[in-house]
A protein has these predicted regions:
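ATP-binding pocket architecture of kinase catalytic cores
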Residues: 36, 40-132
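ATP/Mg2+ or Mg2+-diphosphate-binding catalytic cores
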Residues: 267-344
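All-alpha amphipathic helical-bundle segments outside canonical DNA-binding/catalytic cores
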Residues: 111, 248-260
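A cross-family kinase active-site recognition segment
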Residues: 105-160, 180-181, 210, 283-285
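Active-site activation/catalytic loop segments of kinase-like enzymes and analogous catalytic loops
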Residues: 215-248, 260-283
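Short Pro/Gly-enriched beta-strand edge/turn motifs at strand-loop
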Residues: 18-25, 61, 168-178
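Active-site acidic catalytic loop and adjacent metal/ATP-binding pocket
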Residues: 29-43, 170-216
Length: 344
């Protein structure tokens, strides 16, 4: 962002905050980096998150969602008001889940994973008590979107024998075509949750939320390439925390999750490869600090392992398992060799 535009944007945020809260802003920091939409405003006795998005409609949608959800759960930030295009929300904490979980042993990591899954089920349950199902957009509701999701398998063409002929693309698209009956936050990567001073985990950034199957939120979490929990262990967590009131039989729910997560994994892998060619590999610390794409060979291998495991759980996606395995092995070799994918 150009310096002039950045200072103009910051002035708008600070002016709106001082008008709304009737007190001076002492300092402004950028928890996700200065290029992001949200900033932490420091007042004399509190911190507040201010959000100014390029699309003001998403800001107003997010405020609307938070107000509805907060009526029935404490797993999301409190919306503190909207002034023009700027939304203010409670600061849910500086310990982002993606960084917090990397600091603990496997036992504590599993506890955090269980809480992350439980909180998602809770805010989805809260949404069912509201009128959000009548108000929210239906996500991925057209054939073009579903086809685009499945097209991600082209990323596997370079690994192993590529996409085998026995893969039934039509069956995959049919399985992924879902009526929007459940509220989803959408981007539930672990960098979009934080733990506050009260030790409570809360999710934030609801600007892309809408209606779909519901399992997509868990696909974003498990399919976060920087997420350190194995796919096998995450299935155990899903079974343990499953909400029987979500409207689905658990077996059907996990089958849909497996199919969806297979293609979600190819989309994440495609993003990683594109970024690696432009920027080279990044450090794992940078990825976690700025909630960046997992542009590191270890993270690339992780998302391939997620695709390998979940593709094997459904007969629709089982033909892709070998290619995921080959891709995983390829990135493990790159990690050993220290090889770059950056274009000359």
């Amino acid at each position: 962002m150009a310096k002039g535009k950045k200072s103009e944007r910051m002035t708008r945020i600070v002016d709106a905050a001082e008008e709304h809260f009737a007190r001076p802003v002492l300092k402004v920091t950028a928890p996700g980096g200065e290029g992001r939409s949200s900033f932490r405003l420091h007042f004399d006795n509190m911190d507040v998150i201010a959000t100014l998005r390029p699309n003001f409609r998403r800001t107003h949608l997010e405020a609307f969602v938070l107000e509805r959800l907060r009526t029935y759960c404490d797993d999301v930030p409190e919306c503190l008001g909207v002034v023009g295009e700027v939304m203010f929300q409670a600061d849910v904490g500086r310990r982002r889940l993606n960084q917090e979980i990397a600091q603990h042993d496997s036992t504590k990591q599993m506890d955090l994973a269980a809480e992350a899954v439980a909180t998602i089920f809770r805010f989805q349950s809260a949404a069912r008590k509201t009128d959000l199902n009548k108000m929210m957009p239906h996500l991925g509701a057209n054939p073009g979107w579903v086809n685009g999701l499945v097209d991600g398998i082209e990323t596997l063409d370079s690994y192993g024998s590529g996409v085998p002929q026995q893969f039934d693309r039509v069956a995959a698209c049919e399985r992924l075509t879902q009526p929007g009956q459940q509220f989803v936050k959408w981007d539930c990567r672990s960098g979009n949750a934080a733990i506050g001073r009260d030790e409570k985990m809360r999710w934030f950034d609801f600007e892309y939320s809408g209606m779909r199957h519901g399992a997509e939120d868990f696909a974003w979490l498990i399919g976060d390439e920087a997420w350190p929990i194995s796919p096998e262990n995450m299935v155990d967590v899903m079974i343990e925390q499953f909400d029987p009131n979500c409207g689905y039989d658990i077996a059907d729910y996990l089958d849909y999750l497996s199919v969806y997560l297979t293609f979600h994994s190819t989309q994440r892998l495609k993003l990683i490869l594109n970024e690696a060619q432009k920027r080279g590999w990044l450090s794992k610390e940078r990825v976690r600090k700025y909630d960046d794409a997992g542009v590191h060979p270890e993270f690339a291998a992780q998302i391939c392992d997620v695709g390998r495991y979940f593709s094997a759980q459904s007969k629709i996606t089982a033909p892709l398992t070998q290619s995921f395995e080959a891709a995983k092995n390829s990135f493990q070799e790159i990690l050993k060799e220290g090889r770059s994918l950056k274009s000359a």
